[in-house]
Design a protein with these regions (language model features):
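An N-terminal, well-structured beta->alpha segment
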Residues: 1-68, 72-73, 152-185
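Gly/Ser/Thr-enriched, mixed-charge loops and adjacent short helices
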Residues: 13, 113-239
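Short beta-strand-to-turn element immediately C-terminal to the catalytic PLP-Schiff-base lysine
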Residues: 117-120, 257-261, 338-340
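Phosphate-binding and adjacent anionic-ligand microenvironments
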Residues: 245, 283-460
């Protein structure tokens, strides 16, 4: 049983003892802390907070507690029900709310849930703001509303359609070209909110579709993380040759993976690369992704005359850096597309619409499009440590050892070699160092990772 507290909110498994899991008492405590934070930092606000949730089995229970607590704190709750993470983010700005709470554990298994906290811009809290919420929760410095100041719950199911409309109105989403292409797609929406909103998006785009795991029951048919090892069902379906494209989302629809017409993975790292290539071909500019993302985005950005910048891992770090450098597109290599023309948040609907627009313009197969991008492979490893290990000291030694290479230490240590890179990050929740490495072949990437791992082992 697990309860993890971080600057972006809290997540944990359902059931168990207070303080050990995500249970009703802790949900009340952290919702109250967030509401206290919003109250302290909002003047002349709407007094309204948006609440949306994915379809996981505990969602309705958590939603009831969150909404009731916010009402008890004197806030009106704009409850949008079953909704994607990007839909909830957009609902905050569309309704001019003071903030929002997304009830989702993203790609985690069904026994998990979480509260993800948004500011009035519909973006995740900064590190400082998140730490303030955690501090308020720790001190339990709460004051609830008197009976005459209690809030109310307003149910509003209009935001799916408003989200879709905003996507269709993006300048680079070519609805006519997509309709003329008469695409046929297969979609795995993993028994969550993708099965609610994506059919409506595809209908508006004139795309013929078949859905797998469409029922939003929250009883996930397979591990919900959109990785190749979890996607045998849709990959086998694609091998029938009946579809132009396979589309996979995670339970809250902020991550997006594609499958080629022949059943091969397009590659989660290449979701952002392909969409960025299309965007940059029409609106040249800068890009941002996190340090653990593929070098292919840098190559594509350079091809279009822009500058690529790496950010620390985490959506809020990526969006902050995007604003600093004026990036026209960015995201994370796990299939997260952030397109500021829409909003500063990962959005699979935006990614789907832009990818289909690109495919329609190029008039090629998905596998042919994939072949136009630089070929890189990422290996992922981990170094298990003892709880007493000084991880920061180890990372500092690694940095010193490779001082003659290009080193970035904004988030762990990343070493850039001319034709490959390796990134070491310490986990916030386990005594481990995560090791990501990339090269032109999987063998070379794995060998680089193992080489650095041996360097670390020799230091202990």
């Amino acid at each position: 049983m697990t309860l993890i507290k971080s600057i972006s909110g809290i997540r944990g498994t359902i059931g168990g003892r207070t303080g050990d899991t995500l249970n009703p008492l802790d949900i009340v405590k952290f919702t109250t802390a967030y509401a206290t934070f919003i109250r302290r930092h909002t003047t002349n606000g709407s007094g309204k907070i948006v609440v949306g949730r994915d379809a996981r089995m505990s969602g309705q229970m958590v939603d009831s507690i969150v909404s009731g607590t916010l009402v008890g704190m004197g806030f009106d709750v704009l409850n949008i029900g079953l909704a994607t993470t990007p839909t909830t983010e957009l609902a905050v700005t569309m309704s001019q709310a003071d903030g929002g709470i997304i009830i989702t554990a993203s790609h985690n298994p069904r026994q998990w849930n979480a509260l993800k906290l948004l500011n009035s811009r519909g973006e995740f809290l900064t590190k400082d703001d998140g730490n303030e919420v955690l501090d308020i929760a720790e001190r339990e410095d709460f004051e609830y509303a008197e009976v005459d100041q209690l809030g109310r719950i307003i149910n509003d199911s209009s935001f799916d359609d408003r989200h879709i409309e905003s996507v269709l109105n993006l300048n680079l989403v070519d609805v006519e070209a997509i309709r003329k292409s008469k695409f046929k797609v297969c979609v795995d929406s993993i028994n969550s909110v993708g099965g609610v909103i994506l059919p409506r998006l595809l209908d508006r785009l004139g795309v013929e579709y078949k859905f797998l795991n469409a029922d939003p029951s929250g009883d996930f048919a397979h591990n919900p993380e959109p990785l190749e090892k979890n996607l045998s069902g849709i990959m086998d379906e694609m091998k029938s040759g009946a579809y132009d494209l396979g589309i996979v989302v995670d339970p809250d629809v902020d991550r997006l993976a594609f499958i080629c017409e022949d059943g091969r993975m397009f590659g989660e790292e290449y979701t952002l690369v392909s969409v960025a290539d299309y965007v940059l071909s029409h609106t040249p500019g800068n890009t941002v992704s996190n340090l653990s993302s593929t070098r292919a985005l840098r190559d594509v950005t350079s091809k279009h005359g822009g500058t690529y910048t790496a950010a620390a891992v985490g959506e809020v770090n990526v969006t902050t850096k995007m604003k600093e450098v004026g990036a026209v597109i960015g995201g994370e290599g796990n299939g997260g597309v952030i397109y500021p023309e829409s909003h500063y948040g990962r959005d699979a609907l935006v990614g789907i619409a832009l990818f289909l627009s690109s495919l329609a313009h190029k008039g090629c197969k998905v596998s042919e499009l994939r072949a136009t991008f630089p070929e890189y492979f990422i290996a992922k490893n981990r170094i298990d440590l003892t709880p007493s290990t000084d991880v920061d000291a180890i990372l500092e030694k690694v940095k010193e050892l490779y001082a003659n290479e290009q080193v970035n230490d904004i988030d762990g240590v990343k070493i850039d070699f001319p034709d490959k890179w390796v990134h070491l990050r310490k986990s916030n929740t386990e005594p481990i160092i995560r090791v990501y490495s990339e090269a032109s072949t999987m063998e070379a990437a794995d060998a680089l990772g193992k080489q650095i791992m041996q360097v670390v082992y020799d230091m202990q």
